From Swiss-Prot:
Species of the source: Yersinia pestis bv. Antiqua (strain Angola)
Homology family: Belongs to the class-I aminoacyl-tRNA synthetase family.
Gene: leuS
Protein's name in the database: Leucine--tRNA ligase
Molecular function GO terms recorded: aminoacyl-tRNA deacylase activity; ATP binding; leucine-tRNA ligase activity
InterPro entries per record: aa-tRNA-synth_I_CS, aa-tRNA-synth_Ia, Leu-tRNA-ligase, Leu_tRNA-synth_edit, M/V/L/I-tRNA-synth_anticd-bd, Methionyl/Leucyl_tRNA_Synth, Rossmann-like_a/b/a_fold, tRNAsynth_Ia_anticodon-bd
Amino acid sequence: MQEQYRPEDIETQVQLHWQEKQTFKVTEDASKEKYYCLSMLPYPSGRLHMGHVRNYTIGDVISRYQRMLGKNVLQPIGWDAFGLPAEGAAVKNNTAPAPWTYDNIEYMKNQLKLLGFGYDWDREIATCKPDYYRWEQWFFTKLYEKGMVYKKTSAVNWCPHDLTVLANEQVIDGCCWRCDTKVERKEIPQWFIKITDYAEQLLNDLDTLESWPEQVKTMQRNWIGRSEGVDIVFDVVDSEEKLSVYTTRPDTFMGVTYVAVAAGHPLSLQAAATNPALADFVAECRNTKVAEAEMATMEKKGMATGLYAIHPLTGEKLPIWAANFVLMDYGTGAVMAVPGHDARDWEFATKYNLPIKPVILAADGSEPDLSQEAMTEKGTLFNSGEFDGLNHEDGFNAIADKLVALGVGQRKVNYRLRDWGVSRQRYWGAPIPMVTLEDGTVVPTPEDQLPVILPEDVVMDGISSPIKADPEWAKTTVNGIPGLRETDTFDTFMESSWYYARYTCPQYDDGMLDPAAANYWLPVDQYVGGIEHAIMHLMYFRFFHKLLRDAGLVDSDEPAKRLLCQGMVLADAFYYTGNNGERIWVSPVDAIVERDDKGRIVKAVDAEGHELVYAGMSKMSKSKNNGIDPQVMVEKYGADTVRLFMMFASPAEMTLEWQESGVEGANRFLKRVWRLAFDHTAKGAVKPLDIASLTEEQKSLRRDLHKTIAKVTDDVGRRQTFNTAIAAVMELMNKLGRAPQETEQDRALMQEALLAVVRMLYPFTPHVCFSLWQALGGEGDIDTAPWPIADEQAMVEDSKLVVVQVNGKVRGRITVPADATEQQVRERAGQEHLVAKYLDGITVRKVIYVPGKLLNLVVG
């Protein structure tokens, strides 16, 4: 082996070897235990960023470790290739999305290979290819036939100048990102999949996901939002209309003083027809997009409709108000308002001087003071007629039962979860396989006409979708009847909801999935991705798996057994203020910094002399120009160093602070491992280790070696605390570096230790370990070498170091045989002169002994 560690010489050769040998290519093998490790597939944006590197390094470490345990390991990769950014980039670069996407895929694929990730490249998927989305379209038509798909009008962002639908991220301060025209809300027909039919399953099955982060499961529970309550029907004065509301607090029903309805509710629209002021208010509400998350903090606005509902139990007339905080697409688009016991209702009632009626007593049994705020706690009912004196639960049930008995109420379980709107009015996505025939009938595209192919050779004008702009594209026939194809495309979450299953059989042409392959590999054993996907992607991912199961395509209930959500990668951020007061962000690579003795940044300038403001550590992003290019780091230090730093600098699920000094430290460590191996091999062949004739010093070193193997095995396999595993190997390396190399046994022990160290580091730094394994004479390639097994006998200690205290103060340390009794330890302590002087002529009143660790003598 060469004397110096040169990653540039090693890494290309090793990667070529893997490619030629097809090391990571796998097929189903019933004789071996399978392990499917999957990292969330990347969007081909053009360049890998450090977040990608962290995600894929974690996945690769787990995959290589599991392979060393003798398992049949599948680790695939692909590209989530549809989506809006490609359209923007195509317009900007005067090209079409397809060539831009395919160029990016090629570039990023090479970057992944440079980092040494062990993927089965034969299974590579690009979701924009017809051979992939063909099966998605086919499955959608099957869902339609099962009644799981429907079309309804839903609000979108509409630019009246460009006559196009805008994604939320294309609306800047209420205006179109391209032409700055004020954006309107427009109702258009869209396709939905009934995820709500699976709400109960999605909720209950979270309890089976024992190896998913609790945080993710809690977020999903909240998103599904199961509640038990009552649907209540109000009559409307002088109208045939009925008004339906849902409440989770029927115990407060006697405190309803008004009803609030959404601007788009039929009663609002009916009243607005003869009330111009109300019509203006309704228009304002409907053109203001409000996310549910903003409801709590936004200003509550409303206007009386002039209509009244009748309280089903008291007969009171309740004013009906149109309000901006009621969403038409959530529940019934109407809420009963109990301002005495709901903060939002109280705020609205106070603003518009509406009655506030208390019906729940305070905790001390007194009437609540509602002058400053609502009392939202549950308690005893009063001011509620026949229900006075009932506690919350009894009041809930009594009022619910009464409403049901009168035929104006129905107990109901409700979900916050909404059906999944899968229509996107964009071009770069999979066409939705539906056709509207001449007579207006809507039918699915026949199977023999699938896939509905998206044309890739198009001209982007930045305004309309090429398939919407081309009337010829939509023309088709079904069973000889002319019709028009749907020109909307699928939400890209569709593609990423089932890709994991297609990886099991990417070339399979006889169906969506090959059942034998899918059921061999699935469920995924380990899924790795960011916490930001906790709700959307991970919910659809779970939902789709249940759809596949119910279609007979897979036989498991959940797609992934274990989930690891890696933390973000942070870096220093610097800026200076430009001439117009704007912040100009400077890359940390271009910042020249001064630090104090604690390593804190006290001054920074850029190459042009601008004094920089240090904005602290923040997530690597284009907006703050603080991303570090992985390729630059790989060229400078080697892929193994970058991988090692990524896994060592922080626990996998925590944020990682990028520090180049830490990267340099990782590089120095690999150089030390290389140097120790070089010095060892330079001395020639090694004789076998004779365990029976080891000295105490050699036994101690071998004990440390096998304790390290045991710890690293547990840290990597069970605990997934990769940073502590690396720290343990580093600690062992320090001991090996100091170990004598005088005798044959010393060298034989060093050989055992280095072969173990190289295997423990292999999942993290595979290239250098591949070379070191060869240099050390390891059997075969390290890629097929088994994980080291800790020798239980080696870890048994012949002796123990016992701390001796007198009255709780440490007075000495003694070495005793591992099997020494308490009496023997006391006798040995009495012989220790540092201890003996504190016992001279004094009576020992009490002895506290922790076997093999501590002896405390209480004297006096």
